[in-house]
Amino acid sequence: MSLLTKQSTFQGLSGTVEYTVDYPEQSPVGWALVLHPHPLHGGTRDNKIVTTVARTCVQNGLMAIRPNFRGVGESSGEFDQAVGETADMQACVQHIAQTWPQLAQAPWVLAGFSFGSAVAAQLYAELADQNQSLPTRLMLIGCAVERFRYRPLAMPPDTLMIHGEHDEVVPLSEGMDFARTHQLPLTVIPDAGHFFHGKLLLLRQIVQAHLAGLASA
């Protein structure tokens, strides 16, 4: 995926959270946090949508962080309907700032796929409420936010939403409802299902376009 990939951990609210760091070839110009789908349905940091987004971020000079949520791999704890997972990701943001202080003021990207989109959206809202550093780009792919929403949300107007036309897990109408509620544009990939089989190149191109100009943002 990149010149260098390493494994590490940080302390979440229920114990150890493991994550993978994908480094760009040069010194990173920023970083990305990419969140995986439902832990109880096979979702891991190695999901192909997660790795596709992370790879695209790395190719744009970002250091990409791919955590395993509670109960996945070596991460401690049990599935918590996005509540505990969001709290863990707040701890992750703090961990990144402490571990890589040179990136504390750099642009960063927050992306989530399926269940990960629910954590990403609520993490953004939690950070905003606490006046913490907000991501420069927010991406919600296969948006399942309302299935796991536990708090009010206010999404930035430049949020990137991507959905498959024939999503069999989260119907397109569900993504449209979320987009309508928050007055966001929604990018639909024709003939794509939830896992974007055969459409990863197009997905990567859409993410790449959204990342354009990030370093100067």
Task: Show which residues each predicted segment covers.
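Catalytic histidine-centered segment of alpha/beta-hydrolase-like enzymes
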Residues: 77, 192-204
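Gly/Ala-rich beta-loop-alpha elbow adjacent to hydrolase catalytic centers
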Residues: 112-120
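Short beta-strand/loop motif that positions the catalytic acidic residue
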Residues: 155, 160-163, 167
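Active-site nucleophile loop of the alpha/beta-hydrolase fold
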Residues: 37-38, 139-148
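Short alpha-helix in the alpha/beta-hydrolase fold that links the catalytic acid
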Residues: 171-179
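Acidic catalytic loop of the alpha/beta-hydrolase fold
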Residues: 165-170, 194
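Serine-hydrolase catalytic machinery in alpha/beta-hydrolase-like enzymes
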Residues: 10, 16-103
